[in-house]
């Protein structure tokens, strides 16, 4: 995977860990509370043939985000620049840490 991070393409990205609560019947509810952390990073479509082979048609609903190192985890919610919904439209599905950058694969929520 190529780690190309171009400053001129940086955009504001917000991320927030979900809050999980368990009901009396054992059901788990996911909510998004708190203030999302903000970072500037590069968002790209998934282009590698390996990623497209792994994810198939899902790859059309996925993006690659390259951000400064931070506290990112699979399942965290993501808002891209200009998205102002209460719940995040994107979820982190993979995290790869590099020397000074982190690569996130995000998928649009159904």
Which ranges hold each PLM region?
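Active-site-proximal polar cores
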Residues: 1-29
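Short, conserved turn/kink motifs that form compact alpha/beta structural patches or helix kinks used as
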Residues: 27-110
């Amino acid at each position: 995977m190529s780690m190309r991070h171009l400053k001129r393409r940086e955009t504001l990205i917000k991320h927030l860990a979900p809050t999980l609560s368990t009901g009396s019947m054992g059901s788990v509810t996911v909510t998004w509370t708190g203030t999302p952390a903000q970072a500037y990073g590069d968002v790209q479509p998934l282009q590698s043939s390996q990623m497209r082979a792994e994810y198939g048609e899902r790859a059309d609903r996925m993006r690659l985000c390259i951000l400064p190192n931070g506290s990112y985890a699979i399942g965290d919610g993501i808002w891209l620049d200009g998205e102002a919904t209460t719940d995040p439209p994107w979820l982190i599905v993979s995290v790869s840490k590099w020397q000074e950058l982190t690569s996130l694969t995000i998928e649009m929520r159904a």
